Amino acid sequence: MLEIFDVSYEELMDMRSDDLYRLRKKTFKDRLQWAVNCSNDMEFDEYDNPNTRYLLGIYGNQLICSVRFIELHRPNMITHTFNAQFDDIILPEGNYIESSRFFVDKSGAKTLLGNRYPISYVLFLAVINYTRHHKHTGIYTIVSRAMLTILKRSGWQFDVIKEAFVSEKERIYLLRLPVDKHNQALLASQVNQVLQGSDSALLAWPISLPVIPELV
């Protein structure tokens, strides 16, 4: 089974921090060539701290995917790292969270889960399930153009708050991701087209979904 669950920063330090930071370096520095700081073949920053929670997707004791969350009222990438691009946006008060460092280890997912396993959509669904379980109102996030395309394909009915440029050629987008039952059902339907899981499994938190041999 593919298991996706949440851990605190302290729990991450005890179990998977090196794995996570190495995969983030592999994803964001090596593959996407983002301007991120790395040390000892790992990527981490000031937002990896005790105020942060992480989703970890594990299969066969191997980390496949992850995303991190910070409460929106705390320092985050919208209010600090990309403040120059989004300082004109008034973020809402209330129980919102910011998400960042969303990634799937493509080579690991292909080897362990298969080419057709909808791992990005499963992680999107897990994000909604987590957010609803913890009674957060919604999510704000900054994404690249490539991630914007993946989100559009998923069917998630998000709002683009603002488009900005970090360089002459590189655009980024501030999004509001709703976590209502309608969007949860849309993502569950996308996943169910391939995995054919039960509603109780698809809408649960933590989430545990089968890996189908014929997809590997």
Curated annotation (Swiss-Prot):
One Pfam family per UniProt: Autoind_synth
A GO term, aspect molecular function: N-acyl homoserine lactone synthase activity
Protein's UniProt keywords contain S-adenosyl-L-methionine: yes
PROSITE patterns reported for this sequence: AUTOINDUCER_SYNTH_1, AUTOINDUCER_SYNTH_2
InterPro entries on file: Acyl_CoA_acyltransferase (IPR016181), Autoind_synth_CS (IPR018311), Autoind_synthase (IPR001690)
Domain of life of the native organism: Bacteria
Enzyme class of the recorded protein, top EC level: transferase
Entry's Gene Ontology BP terms: quorum sensing; signal transduction
Catalytic activity annotation: a fatty acyl-[ACP] + S-adenosyl-L-methionine = an N-acyl-L-homoserine lactone + S-methyl-5'-thioadenosine + holo-[ACP] + H(+)
UniProt keywords, alphabetically: Autoinducer synthesis, Quorum sensing, S-adenosyl-L-methionine, Transferase
PANTHER family tied to this protein: ACYL-HOMOSERINE-LACTONE SYNTHASE, ISOVALERYL-HOMOSERINE LACTONE SYNTHASE
Family from the record: Belongs to the autoinducer synthase family.
Function of the protein: Required for the synthesis of an acyl-HSL autoinducer that binds to YukR and which is involved in the regulation of motility and morphology.
Entry protein name: Acyl-homoserine-lactone synthase
Underlying gene: yukI
